[in-house]
Amino acid sequence: MLSILDILEDTTVDGPGFRTAIYAAGCPNGCPGCHNPESWDINRGRWMSTDEILQKVLADNFADGTFSGGDPMYQPEGFTELARAIKRQSRKNIWCYTGYTFEALLRNPRQAKLLEYIDVLVDGKFQKDLRDEELYFRGSSNQRLIDVQASLKANETVSYYYNPGI
């Protein structure tokens, strides 16, 4: 079971193309200026089974998936189960937003397991003083777009570069 604040279909701001965005409830960071402070409390969400969420993600053949929040890494086991099911039953790519850094996630076995199924990670806490509205898919310039699968293979952080012209 996962505590979910909202599920948005056909969003275009949480990664490239059309996406089904799953907004997790619960976040330990409490970043000043957060665009979604109601997501901090895990009890603000609705408890949903991974199967229930999976059906919503699979219902749109053309949309990929995004885990956001809140922080999906606050509920790593449930999101790992969901991501594994998405990958087994579709060819969708999965983006994940988190306030943790990639390096910190690798040190936590529960969170590192989820990375096995994530294609692109947007990492780092939102920092209001580094806010930049010109960035694609990030709120502040300290946040990184990371190609997770390439990073895991290379055993070093590999940036993901988004080219809006493609």
Which residues does each PLM region occupy?
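N-terminal [4Fe-4S]-dependent radical SAM core
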Residues: 1-23, 32, 36-42, 157-158, ...
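Conserved Radical SAM active-site core
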Residues: 2-5, 18, 36-114
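Residues at the C-termini of beta-strands that transition into short coil/loop
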Residues: 8, 125, 149
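Flexible, glycine-rich phosphate/dinucleotide-binding loops
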Residues: 13, 103, 130, 154
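Conserved C-terminal portion of the radical SAM core fold
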Residues: 61-68, 93-94, 122-128, 152-166
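P-loop/Walker A phosphate-binding loop and immediately adjacent motor/lid segment at beta-alpha junctions
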Residues: 75-84, 90, 131-166
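Receiver (REC) domain switch/active-site residues of two-component response regulators
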Residues: 119
